[in-house]
Amino acid sequence: MEIKYLLTVFLVLLIVSDHCQAFLSSLIPSAISGLISAFKGRRKRDLNGQIDHFKNFRKRDAELEELLSKLPIY
């Protein structure tokens, strides 16, 4: 009876440790590459692109509001 519980606990610990190892092995390299690219300045924000995106969003929102106002209310 005790061997069943020991085996179950062992398998659960094995699965949990495998998931933690996989998580950490993917997290650490991505964090290091993010820090390196931040120090090198590769991730500069393009404000003009963000402004254009916001203008397009506002324009589409206004067009949608206009379209919905023309639809009959049921």
From Swiss-Prot:
Q: Does the keyword Secreted apply?
A: yes
Which residues are recorded as modified (Lysine amide)? Answer: 40
- A Gene Ontology BP annotation from the UniProt entry: defense response to bacterium
Q: Where in the cell is it found?
A: Secreted; Target cell membrane
Residues spanning the signal sequence: 1-22
| GO CC, alphabetical | extracellular region; membrane; other organism cell membrane
- Listed name of the protein: Peptide BmKb2
Annotated organism of origin? Olivierus martensii
